[in-house]
Each structure stands twice: as C-alpha cells, then as structure tokens.
Curated annotation (Swiss-Prot):
This is Ribonuclease HII. It is found in: Cytoplasm. PROSITE patterns: RNASE_H_2. Coiled coil: none annotated. The lineage of its organism: Bacteria, Pseudomonadati, Pseudomonadota, Gammaproteobacteria, Oceanospirillales. Its main location: cytoplasm. Pfam families: RNase_HII (PF01351). It comes from Chromohalobacter salexigens (strain ATCC BAA-138 / DSM 3043 / CIP 106854 / NCIMB 13768 / 1H11). It comes from the Bacteria. The keyword Metal-binding applies. InterPro entries: RNase_HII (IPR022898), RNase_HII/HIII (IPR001352), RNase_HII/HIII_dom (IPR024567), RNaseH-like_sf (IPR012337), RNaseH_sf (IPR036397). Disulfide bonds: none annotated. SUPFAM superfamilies: Ribonuclease H-like. Keywords: Cytoplasm, Endonuclease, Hydrolase, Manganese, Metal-binding, Nuclease. Signal peptide: none annotated.
Length: 200
C-alpha cells in the first residue's frame, strides 16, 4: 500500500532513465548521481529507496542492476565544484553527467525530487521517486553504493574522522573530529560547519 497517487508517465518507450543522487547533505566529498534504464525482459526484484535497504541488500542489488539493466551510469560533482557552484547546481551537474554517460541514449527522464536538472532530454520530476518507480530506485541504489565506497576509501586514509561510520554527514562524531583536527582537502569549504573550523 502506498500513500502516493498513481504515477502517470508521458512516455511509453523503452529508453526511460531513472535519475537520482546521493550526498547533498554530507560535509565532505562529491555528490554522486546515477541514471538507469531498466530492461523489462530482465526484471530486478526488490528495487526501492536505497535508504530503506540494508548495506548487504544494496550491494547485492547494485550488482544485479549492473548486470541486468539495459544501461546504467554513475557520475559526480566534486567538493570543489560544490563549493564553486553551490550544492543545488552541483547536484544537477552530476545528474547531467550521469545521463550523458549512459551507453544507451535516454529518450525520457524520471528524476527524483521536484526540479529537473536542465538536460535536453525531456522528462518529469517525481517527488519521493525512489519509492515510486523502479528505475529511480535503481539509480538511488547505484549512487549510494558508489558514494559509500568513496567514504570507506577516505576512511582508510583518514580513520580518525570516522567516515566509514557516518559517510560524511554532520554527526556528533564528525563535528567533533572537525573541531579537533580541522578540515581535510576533501571537505566542502562552503558548508557552514566546515567553514567554522577552517584555518584563516
């Protein structure tokens, strides 16, 4: 059962790409976007909003998406680009990059959220789209698995910040590490909690 009205899509072809992002809220690292065109002949069971799935389930589904989707791509906008553009515009840049990186050209986009990313391919926004359409759910999963792996890699280089645990979000642990150690090169300088602890 869902609280959402039925999703009406103005496209009935086979090149519909779901688009989603992960990483707008963290204080460190890139914002990551993914675009996925599912193959109706190879359905993937269990696609949902990545935040509702266990890490083990997300990893298994990410493998299935890469193997069974008609096309998929992941892209990002760096912390430097976030600082230069702001997080809103950087998120849309990452989305456009993911759409452009698809090995099969999308004909229609379903984008999670309430703003289109400014791509020339037509489409529509879907609020809570990762819960309402499988292609957006698949994009959410790929983006989160990719970004989480980046945070684990950053944790291995800087374990004192705890990135593997909080994934860069402004948790008490992360804020305490910032206060104690200061920001890393990978931190987003334009975000207030980071700006506060930068050395002048």
């Amino acid at each position: 059962m869902t609280d959402f009205p039925p999703l009406v899509i103005d496209y009935h072809g086979s090149r519909l790409a779901g688009v989603d992002e992960v990483g707008r809220g963290p204080l460190v690292g890139a914002v990551v976007a993914a675009a996925v065109i599912l193959d109706p002949a190879r359905p993937i069971e269990g696609l949902a909003d990545s935040k509702t799935l266990s890490e083990k389930r997300r990893l298994a589904l990410a493998d299935a998406i890469r193997e069974q989707a008609a096309a998929c791509a992941v892209a990002e906008a760096s912390a430097e680009e976030i600082d230069a553009l702001n997080i809103f515009h950087a998120t849309h840049l990452a989305m456009r990059r993911a759409i452009d990186a698809l090995p099969v050209t999308a004909e229609y986009l379903l984008v999670d959220g309430n703003r289109m990313p400014g791509h020339h391919v037509p489409g529509q926004c879907v609020v809570k789209g990762d819960r309402r359409h499988a292609a957006i759910g698949a994009a959410s999963i790929l983006a989160k698995v990719t970004r989480d792996a980046q945070m684990v890699a950053l944790h291995e280089r800087h374990p004192e910040y705890g990135f593997a645990r909080h994934k860069g979000y402004p948790t008490r642990e992360h804020l305490a590490a910032l206060e104690r150690l200061g920001p890393l090169e990978e931190h987003r300088r334009s975000f207030a909690p980071v700006k506060q602890w930068q050395l002048l």
